[in-house]
Amino acid sequence: MRCPFCHNEDTQVLDTRVSDEGDTIRRRRRCAKCDKRFTTYERVELALPAIVKKNGSRVEYSHDKLASSIKLALRKRSVSSDSVDESIARIEEKLLSFGEKEIPSERVGELVMRELKRLDKVAYIRFASVYRSFADIESFESALKELK
């Protein structure tokens, strides 16, 4: 592991610990050259599928984009950030469980709507109105009836 201070390649591991969740290893290291200490984290990198948009273009999956979309729908709603993080984790687990290299954006949108419906009905309607491109009041009424 290269030292972030002097870029020397010779470093020594002083301490190794597994996180409480068991999915990350924390290593405390010391540089043999400059003697500075630093911490590294090791975790399994899971390859989430590429997203195929409606126009056929492909984009890399973005955790940040998913999180910002959900948070935008939940803006000014009383939903804890832990609940949001758990929902995002469930969506990502579902995407991984499909075992596909590519997945249509519509499928991701449906997963988001399912989670929002569980978290907050108002956020669900907000997201659905944009995602489903509601054009009129009848579209809103139809979505509201689905919630009842």
Curated annotation (Swiss-Prot):
Keywords: ATP-binding, DNA-binding, Metal-binding, Nucleotide-binding, Repressor, Transcription, Transcription regulation, Zinc, Zinc-finger. GO terms for molecular function: ATP binding; DNA binding; zinc ion binding. Binds 1 zinc ion. Residues 49-139 form the ATP-cone domain. It comes from the Bacteria. Its cofactor is Zn(2+). A zinc finger (unnamed) spans 3-34. InterPro entries: ATP-cone_dom, NrdR-like_N, RNR_NrdR-like. One of its GO terms (biological process) is negative regulation of DNA-templated transcription. PANTHER family: TRANSCRIPTIONAL REPRESSOR NRDR (PTHR30455:SF2). NCBIfam families: transcriptional regulator NrdR (TIGR00244). Belongs to the NrdR family. Negatively regulates transcription of bacterial ribonucleotide reductase nrd genes and operons by binding to NrdR-boxes. This is Transcriptional repressor NrdR. It comes from Polynucleobacter necessarius subsp. necessarius (strain STIR1).
